[in-house]
Amino acid sequence: MREDPFEYLEDIQNPNVVSWALSESRGCVERLKPLSDKIVGLALRYYSIPVLYSFSRNRAGLFFLKRDLAYSVNLSIDGSTRVLVSSRELGEDAVIHSYYIDREGKLFAYFYTLKGSDVGELVVAEVDTLSTVDRIRGSISDVVFLGGGRYYYTKFFREGRCPDGVESPCERVFLRDGGRDEMVFGEGLPRNHFVSLKASTDYSHALVRVSYGWARDTLYAGPLGSSSRWVKVYEGGFRSKLVDLAGGSYLAILYDGEKFGRLVKLGSGTSELVPERGEYLQDAIVVGSYIVASYVRHASSYLAVFDLEGRPVREVTFDEPASVAWLSSYGSGGFVELRYFTRPYEVIEVSASNGLSFRKVAEHPRVVDAEVVEGFAESYDGTKVHYFWIRRRSASSKVVVYGYGGFSVSLTPVFAPWIPVFIELGYDVVVANLRGGSEYGEKWHEAGMRDKKVNVFYDYIAVASKFKSAGFKVVGLGRSNGGLLIGAVITMEPGLLDVAAIGYPVLDMLKFHKLYIGSAWIPEYGNPDDPKDREYLVKYSPYHNIREGVRYPPTIIYTGLYDDRVHPAHALKFYAKLKGYGNDVCLRLETSSGHAGSSPEVIAREVADVVAFIEESLSKSLRGS
């Protein structure tokens, strides 16, 4: 094992470590403050644009989340909107992540966290009076109301053990009844398995998905009110998910074969409804007697409608690159939520009451004055790598190349407020669709996993090199797994990027599984304790591949001191090693944000500092200093 001179920085309970880290961060922030103060107003303007999302409907009316300078759960009845809860009531830098409603419209629940933590509180309240009827602490999700104040929920255990003794990370389903909890599903599931739960649209059945990381799923289902009768309905050794109950059969998506996704019925056997179409099947809902499915074509979404026997009815395409960010059904209708690079949202309500109709119920006008064009770069092995180019109306000489490339996450169009900040400051922005995502199906994802992870880095290098060759100053930007990407790129090709911005990153690939919940990522990255996996991990691990005497691009590394998903030690150690070799590197440590985000004000200030570092670094480069 190689000696790790900065291992002590993993102990963020040590006051000396915290003091050093905060001191380094203060130096970074003070250095950037004159320029950052000029940018923060611009950033806050875009982060305060209201965005409506997560629409659903029950007997009480239309529910949705709203994000502007706060987060809120809202109820709309006959055009009049009522705020049920706002994050301003919940504490400093509170974020409402999700909400849940019962079928009758009497109760709702919401889960919120403070300062970007993954651990927070679930609150159950009455819709009419807003009186709180229950609270649960933890990492809570997937609430399904049963009536009579009873409900299921899933709880993710980050440390210690699950109630059945399995070592964390692990997840279980609980029944909450009168303030008492009973574990009803998941007993004995090994660590690093996740459980998701939802009810069929008619509330008759529970639909359960057990996932081993992002590699394979097992599906369970049964009567909603009788958890002892939930049984395995499908296991195939690949990714899959249940959609709904339709015509007495379970409708599911299987990512077998070429792994683009096909729709099947599960019953006494498996019968195919809609075969693979050569494009990624992202999700589907049942609305009345129709199936509405979202597909991805070159990283943009379109809708395909089928009847319940799988016969095609129609396709719905959009005028510009778009993402279907949310599909939900309430039986006779449903919602399709769209995202764009240039405008925040568009919401369409689908109705099956008289045939099938689509009606726009909410939208925000265009706010980014740029055009979106598409292109391809050729990776080292001949693979064509798609990208979106958000291009200013006037020519630019600076481009930010953003990537992720992992965990089956597709970088489809989305309104990210940092993009117009860069556009207004004279940059173009490129979003690269690298292997490791699912833009081209699960095979595309698998081509960027484990020992094939280097494909992701080479894909990014191909896209960035194309713009570098065209004369652009190239800025590399990535967050989380995308931070790993940028860290790997600057250690593999130190001369490629003119500036690097690495956010909330995973950078030590030999220790990630021992820091916080990192072992949950073993299915994606591999196991550092396995000699075969360790052999390829050490070859690209950014922290282990910083070399003395090499000039790396100016780099800002930003993270949250209390990020409880990706340990801040990844950032601290990488920073210390880069700085120790005399590189221009800046550490920004946020104390009010974590992996789960924070208030728009906190994020706007963080973005302003990151952009200020980039501006400062490019200015020095242009002056030749």
Name each model feature, range by range.
Residues 17-100, 111, 193-224, 230-243, ...:
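Non-catalytic accessory segments flanking enzyme active sites
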Residues 123-126, 169-178, 220-224, 264-266, ...:
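Beta-propeller blade signature
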Residues 62, 108-110, 151-152, 206, ...:
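Hydrophobic beta-strand positions that form the internal "hydrophobic ladder"
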Residues 434-625:
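Active-site-proximal cap/loop segments of hydrolase catalytic domains
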Residues 59, 104-108, 148-149, 203, ...:
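Conserved loop/turn motif of beta-propeller repeat scaffolds
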Residues 84, 90-142:
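A conserved hydrophobic secondary-structure block that centers on an alpha-helix together
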Residues 88-97, 116, 362-475, 479-480, ...:
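Cap/lid segment of the alpha/beta-hydrolase catalytic domain
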Residues 66-71, 89-93, 112-121, 136-138, ...:
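A flexible loop/linker signature enriched in serine peptidases of the S9 family
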